[in-house]
Structures are given as C-alpha cells and as structure tokens.
Amino acid sequence: IKLADTKTADGGTLSLFEQDGDYSISFDGQELMHSRLNASEKLLGELGLARLKMQSSERVLVGGLGLGFTLQRVLSTIRKDSQIDLVELLPDVIDWNRNHLSKLNGYLLKDARVKAIAQDVIQTIRDAEPEKYDAIILDVDNGPIAMVSPGNDSLYAQAGLSGLFRALRPGGRVVVWSAGPDKGFEKRLKR
C-alpha cells in the first residue's frame, strides 16, 4: 500500500510503502530501503561512534533519515547529554517518520537529543563551524557510487571531503554508507 510520495528537486518520485507491517522507500520505482533489511543502517550508526572517547556531550551529525535505523542505533549508543543534528533533505521524509512510521522509528524524533533539520547535508557541512562534530555519519543517496541524485557527487569529491574533515573534531570519525566499494573514493579519503 502506498502511504505517501513526494517529488525530489530533480523531478523524481520518492514513495513510502507499507505491507503487512513492513515499510519501504522507493525512488522512481526502485526500492532504496526496507524495514526488514536494516542491518547495514544500524551498523553504520555503530561504526560512526566506535572508538570515540564518549566522554561527554558528543555532537553527532547524521545525514539522511530514511526509515530511522541509523538514528536508532546512534541514540542507543550515545550519552544522555549528547546532541544529534539529524539532517534530511526532504521535509516529507521527516513527516513520514513522525506520522506513518511513528511505531517503527518515528518516535526517535521526539528524543530531546535530536534536532531534525530539513536541509541538504552538503549545506549543513559547509555552514558548520570548524571542529563542530565528534562523528559525521552519512547515509546519503547510495554513497559515493550508483547515485540517485547526481548533485550529491560534490559531497564525495575532494572539496566535499575537505569540508567533512574541517567540521570534524580531532579524534572524530566520518562514516559513509556505500552501495559497494569505490577505489576512487578510497583514494580521495587518503589524501
């Protein structure tokens, strides 16, 4: 059952579906995520916080809300005095989580540690003060390869990576979800 859909800036259609208590999000008919297949999103949140000192008041940027599984893992890991800037490009996806997905993960948006921001994460990173975040966790598009929206390639280009690392505190961590290995992206990360 289609619960909702919205248009993206490039004219594509993002749709939310429910079937027998399971949810999925598709872009122009291609399934991007499913509530039964959430291990990689949870692992992303876990890896984003791994090896951080977790002393006090961590500041975490989560780019991309989707069905909320990365946010769920981050919230279950960080301290009570931490803050998460949850940045989602499409305001409708935030609304879907609050309304249609409230029982799945939408309740997470009510957590006082979460600030939901409807904005392009690329802009959020550009506008960030230097050394603002302890962790930056990105599940944007399909990662550096197989992108749904070509405009997202600037996030994974050298200038985008420089912005990410500028916004990261010393000892912090950037973790990026990717649909598969990308040797070019790996080389850019090493520069």
Where are these regions (language model features)?
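N-terminal auxiliary segments of SAM/dcSAM-dependent transferases
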Residues: 1-26
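A short, aromatic/hydrophobic, helix- or strand-capping loop or linear motif
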Residues: 182
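A SAM-dependent methyltransferase catalytic signature shared across enzymes that methylate proteins
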Residues: 185-191
